[in-house]
Amino acid sequence: MTDLKTIIEEAYQNKDSFTTDTVPKKIHQAIHQTIELLDNGELRIAEKQNGQWNTNEWAKMAILLYFKTEPLKTFDAGYTFFYDKIPLKYTNNTSQPQSGVRVVPHAIVRKGAYLAPNTVLMPSYINIGAYVDSGTLIDTWATVGSCAQIGKNVHLSGGAGIGGVLEPLQAHPTIIEDDCFIGARSEIVEGVMVEKGSVISMGVFVGQSTPIYNRQTQEITYGRIPAGSVVIPGSLPSKDGHYNRYSAIIVKQVDEKTRSKVSLNELLREG
């Protein structure tokens, strides 16, 4: 994989020197090999090592090169046609899902996204570079953006959106860690991290500029929901006191033992 990384990095530095028609065979093969590694889960855009998430920038480079070098193609969906550069993940009988993966009709998964065993997709959308770990449910009309990392046993409720982050290369993708619940119509975007075991209420919107207020500590932070947080939508007064600004409110933090004994509705109502 080291050789592949070197080829991709060098190609990205010289990306203006070739087009779809003139891309060297060596680079073309390296791009496709990288996409295959992402597709089967052998490579991830981001990985947690020693408690820290690290981004594989070269894998992002490969995706951007994939967009640049692939020609537009016609995809026959039976009842209509689509025109795109990136094929879908399950395009024929030889590309079968992992054990226990359920893909309900009208769910769409792009090539280069990985679905671990025992994941369930209701009609939803998973973009290239995304990683969805085992036991996770992606509910109806939920979307998982490019390069987003979704942990084990996560529930993305109906209409929830997890934003994609391809550029800048050094930016972390949006990350939802293990055992999280993301409420209906909530949006977690711009590389925000929701740590393990957190519960996000319905209709919570969190980007990098969204204030995250911890009711217990009275701290305001940005870009990260701490482990075990129970979060609801709210607002904070502006500095001049003339208006209120939308905020995400951490009403409490619970451990795994409490989470296992108390229903999600109870946790949110107690807030």
UniProtKB/Swiss-Prot annotation:
Keyword annotations = Acyltransferase, Amino-acid biosynthesis, Cytoplasm, Diaminopimelate biosynthesis, Lysine biosynthesis, Repeat, Transferase
List the GO molecular function terms: 2,3,4,5-tetrahydropyridine-2,6-dicarboxylate N-succinyltransferase activity
* Superkingdom of origin: Bacteria
Q: Where in the cell is it found?
A: Cytoplasm
Which Gene Ontology cellular component terms are annotated? cytoplasm
Q: Which reaction does it catalyse?
A: (S)-2,3,4,5-tetrahydrodipicolinate + succinyl-CoA + H2O = (S)-2-succinylamino-6-oxoheptanedioate + CoA
Q: Which residues bind substrate?
A: 102, 139
- CDD domains found in the cross-reference section: LbH_THP_succinylT (cd03350)
Q: Name one GO biological process term.
A: diaminopimelate biosynthetic process
Q: Which residues form a coiled coil?
A: none
- Annotated EC: 2.3.1.117
Instruction: Write out the pathway annotation from the protein's UniProt entry.
Output: Amino-acid biosynthesis; L-lysine biosynthesis via DAP pathway; LL-2,6-diaminopimelate from (S)-tetrahydrodipicolinate (succinylase route): step 1/3
What is the protein's quaternary organization?
A: Homotrimer.
Could you say which protein family the record assigns here? Answer: Belongs to the transferase hexapeptide repeat family.
Record PANTHER family: 2,3,4,5-TETRAHYDROPYRIDINE-2,6-DICARBOXYLATE N-ACETYLTRANSFERASE, ACETYLTRANSFERASE
Write down what this protein is called: 2,3,4,5-tetrahydropyridine-2,6-dicarboxylate N-succinyltransferase
Taxonomy of the source species: Bacteria, Pseudomonadati, Pseudomonadota, Gammaproteobacteria, Legionellales
